[in-house]
């Protein structure tokens, strides 16, 4: 089966995809020569492309699912004027969207779906820095496309709600369906703290769920737990800023609204608030990584544990 070594180009039209060695411990006769199971493709077409770019494709699709369900829940609530949704349904939309997005993408990319997650794992878990811009680009694009799809789906309702106007602020504002905007009474410092705090909790749970020495989790338990964490954050901490907690989730849809007629106000509104969801979640994630690794994590991947080495010894 294919593994992380990726495609190996051979002479001629065929390509060999990955290989898993049989060392005699399983799947073969003990002591037999090492062999490899390979997938040989007779051309280097689409299969080659989707294998080579499986990680960004997975991040794109996972983030698309997260934002589509979350923004869709906001659209349904706002455009129906609360008749078919409320804050709880929005919180559930994002929580379920995150759980499903991780479930879809986790096997292929790890299911980051958030630049704060990617950067935190690069600093504290040795995630390759060369992949960081690729992951973040895929996440932003996934969020952008999700916003476009939800906009097209709800376009009749948007016209019914606001007519031809595309307002960022006001009674008929619809920009907040797609990107986050703070409550008018919030200061920049207060909004920054709120976004960082929410992301702290999210990343803390993610680090716990991916800690091999913590309670064992499965591909089902981890996404559900992380999704429920986002729902809990939304219910308890989300009111003041709209709980972006994710630069891609906010910037992708914000960029989309800029292009479709909401104008530069999507960036200038509320004292240029747009930079808060870009920076604060990353800060919150880094603090979460520092606290978790300082108090709980025993693994060797963290630079905080650079003097720790684990040895496997036979027990008499």
Curated annotation (Swiss-Prot):
It comes from the Eukaryota. It is found in: Cell membrane; Membrane. Residues 1-59, 108-131, 209-219, 293-316 are cytoplasmic. Residues 81-86, 153-187, 241-271 are extracellular. GO terms for cellular component: plasma membrane. Its main location: membrane. InterPro entries: Aquaporin-like, MIP, MIP/Aquaporin, MIP_CS. One of its GO terms (molecular function) is water channel activity. Residues 1-31 are annotated as: Disordered. Induction: Expression is increased significantly in arbuscule-enriched cortical cells and extraradical mycelia of maize roots under drought stress. The chain crosses the membrane at residues 60-80, 87-107, 132-152, 188-208, 220-240, 272-292. Glycans are attached at residue 172. Keywords: Cell membrane, Glycoprotein, Membrane, Repeat, Transmembrane, Transmembrane helix, Transport. Belongs to the MIP/aquaporin (TC 1.A.8) family. This is Aquaglyceroporin-2. It comes from Rhizophagus irregularis.
């Amino acid at each position: 089966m294919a593994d992380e070594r990726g495609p190996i180009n051979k002479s001629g039209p065929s390509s060999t995809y990955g290989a898993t060695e049989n060392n005699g411990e399983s799947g073969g006769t003990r002591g037999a020569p090492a062999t490899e199971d390979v997938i040989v493709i007779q051309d280097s077409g689409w299969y080659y492309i989707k294998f080579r770019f499986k990680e960004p494709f997975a991040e794109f699709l996972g983030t698309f699912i997260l934002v589509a369900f979350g923004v869709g829940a906001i659209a349904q609530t706002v455009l129906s004027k609360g008749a078919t949704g409320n804050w709880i349904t929005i919180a559930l939309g994002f929580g379920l969207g995150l759980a499903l997005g991780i479930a879809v993408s986790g096997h292929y990319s790890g299911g980051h779906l958030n630049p704060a997650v990617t950067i935190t794992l690069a600093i504290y878990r040795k995630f390759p820095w060369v992949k960081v811009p690729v992951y973040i680009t895929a996440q932003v694009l996934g969020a952008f496309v999700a916003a476009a799809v939800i906009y097209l789906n709800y376009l009749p309702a948007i016209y019914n709600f606001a007519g031809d106007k595309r307002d960022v602020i006001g009674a008929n504002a619809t920009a907040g369906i797609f990107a986050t905007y703070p409550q008018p009474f919030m200061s920049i410092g207060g909004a920054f703290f709120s976004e960082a705090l929410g992301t702290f909790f999210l990343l803390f749970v993610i680090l716990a769920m991916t800690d091999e020495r913590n309670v064992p989790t499965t591909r089902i338990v981890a996404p559900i737990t992380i999704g429920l964490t986002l729902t809990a954050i939304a219910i308890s901490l989300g009111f003041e800023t709209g709980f972006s907690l994710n630069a891609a989730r906010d910037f992708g849809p914000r960029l989309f609204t800029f292009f479709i007629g909401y104008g530069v106000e999507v960036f200038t509104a509320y004292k240029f608030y747009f930079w808060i969801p870009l920076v604060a979640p990353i800060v919150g994630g880094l603090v979460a990584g520092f606290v978790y690794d300082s108090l709980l994590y025993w693994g060797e991947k963290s630079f905080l544990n650079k003097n720790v080495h684990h040895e496997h010894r036979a027990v008499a």
